[in-house]
């Protein structure tokens, strides 16, 4: 029996919407990364993007455990000399809540062109509204 290998042109991708209200950040991000890669499908192939499109709503209501709200620090660099910046989880949620989920999921995806293609299928919104109703996404309970 020959091993099945998925081909990029035959992969069927579904659209799902996930509500992040009250969900733990890491547990949510691992499941999102798994579904973006396509590991939940029987036809999963490591070198082919077999994952689905995922819309995350209410990103501003995601939860963390322990003291991470004040202790977890995000760092980035502006590109200028001495341009290192930092913000706590609480400040990031106030400033740009989508980035918190995006950073968590991006770190769990493969590095390289395939990982970037998978990451592009993730759509994160701070509020309850999204602009993908035409795709008729199914509700995914995580």
From Swiss-Prot:
Organism: Actinobacillus succinogenes (strain ATCC 55618 / DSM 22257 / CCUG 43843 / 130Z)
Keywords: Ribonucleoprotein, Ribosomal protein
Keyword set includes Iron: no
Quaternary state and interactors: Part of the 50S ribosomal subunit.
Record bears the keyword Ribosomal protein: yes
Function noted in UniProt: This protein is one of the early assembly proteins of the 50S ribosomal subunit, although it is not seen to bind rRNA by itself. It is important during the early stages of 50S assembly.
Database matches in InterPro entries: Ribosomal_uL13, Ribosomal_uL13_bac-type, Ribosomal_uL13_CS, Ribosomal_uL13_sf
Protein name: Large ribosomal subunit protein uL13
An annotated GO cellular component: cytosolic large ribosomal subunit
Similarity field: Belongs to the universal ribosomal protein uL13 family.
Top-level taxon of origin: Bacteria
Family matches, as HAMAP family: Ribosomal_uL13
GO BP term (any one): translation
UniProt cross-references to Pfam families, sorted A to Z: Ribosomal_L13
Any one Gene Ontology molecular-function term assigned to this protein's record: mRNA binding
């Amino acid at each position: 029996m020959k091993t099945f290998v998925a081909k990029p042109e035959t992969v069927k991708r579904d659209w799902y919407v996930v509500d992040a209200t009250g969900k733990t950040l890491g547990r949510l991000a691992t499941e999102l990364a798994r579904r973006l890669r396509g590991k939940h499908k029987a036809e999963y192939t490591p070198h082919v993007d077999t994952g689905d499109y995922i819309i995350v709503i209410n990103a501003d209501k995601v939860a963390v455990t322990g003291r991470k709200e004040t202790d977890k620090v995000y760092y980035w660099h502006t590109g200028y000399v001495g341009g290192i910046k930092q913000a706590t989880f609480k400040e990031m949620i106030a400033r740009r809540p989508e980035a918190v989920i995006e950073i968590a999921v991006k770190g769990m995806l493969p590095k390289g062109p395939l990982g970037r293609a998978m990451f592009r299928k993730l759509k994160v919104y701070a509020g309850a509204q999204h602009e993908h109703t035409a795709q008729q996404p199914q509700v995914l309970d995580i």
